[in-house]
């Protein structure tokens, strides 16, 4: 259901936005961890895709740039786990 944001006070709007951003970051970390495990298991290739990139574009319907950024972030965080905490 779509919320009428014009009904929110300034403070409510700011608080709501901050909450959404926190949730979004949490989901991003979870998404990257899932991609990391998929990459480790080579599940995209096992599922018939030439690469994790192709899986992300075709199956997850990410734009090419989004797929590339997420895969790069996933692989960097796999090498340097501290990156997850920075997100």
Model region roles, listed by residue range:
Residues 49-87:
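Amphipathic alpha-helical "recognition" segments
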Residues 1-60:
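N-terminal acidic-hydrophobic amphipathic loop/helix motif that frequently occurs adjacent to catalytic
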């Amino acid at each position: 259901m779509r919320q009428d944001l014009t009904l929110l006070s300034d403070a409510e709007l700011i608080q709501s936005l901050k909450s959404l951003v926190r949730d979004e970051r949490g989901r991003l970390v979870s998404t990257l961890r899932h991609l990391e495990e998929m990459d480790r298991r080579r599940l995209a290739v096992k599922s018939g895709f030439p690469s994790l990139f192709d899986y992300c574009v075709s199956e997850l319907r990410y734009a090419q740039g989004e797929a590339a950024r997420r895969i790069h972030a996933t692989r960097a965080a796999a090498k340097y786990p501290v990156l997850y905490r920075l997100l």
